[in-house]
Amino acid sequence: MKKLLLILLCLPIIGFGQQTYVPDDNFENYLEANGMGNGIANDDYVTTASINTINTLNVNNMNIASLVGIEGFIGLKYLYCGLNQLTSLDLSNNINLENLHCPENTIATIDFSNSVSIMHVNCENNQIYSLDISQNSLLGHLELKDNNLFYLNLKNGANTLLNHMRVTDNPNLTCISVDDSLWATNNWNVFQDIDPQQYFSNNCSTTGIEELSTNKKILKVTDLLGRETKQTNQPLFYIYDDGAVEKKIVIE
């Protein structure tokens, strides 16, 4: 009976004390200064209960290099994180996200595929090389100007809702997968939304992909969603130590 009572007394403490790991000092300091921390400066943690109901987060121009910990913001709808030093952005746990603004970083990999309610995305001036929005059928605004795109899949079954789409200044991007190539050509070209070498297709081929020189060190291999993988027989991105990205398929 005493053991049972002790367990019951500890449960509220355990629930209240759940922590989220936030390794970036500038990100943690912002959360601490704005009532979203655990009261302990520079310990790399914040109290989960203080962030999981936050609706809007604005960390623009905070010199942040990592947003690890953003997964604890499960109620987040609006995220503003532009003008930082982010190299990747994993929003796979932020399923309620509706608006994302992350321009002027050096983001190479990004994942908001689980954010099925997302409507507005601005990721211009980054290094994103692959993006698949096939699960984001409510998207109405997509800004990807000045990135490093090799692959872009806009085939989400609702392209007519995407009334603003811009992917200019992506010299490595040629074929863009869409629901209806004729509709896309007639609607998205009008406002010079794509580069001259880019075109829309219902079925972009994954064969005959341009291969770059491999006389350099491979840092990691990712799939089309930016996830590290060792699987073959699918389009993969090889990321090298000089910043180059090579796209190819290994058949086994």
Which role does the model predict for each range below?
Residues 67-71, 86-92, 107-113, 128-134, ...:
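The feature encodes a structural signal of leucine-rich repeats
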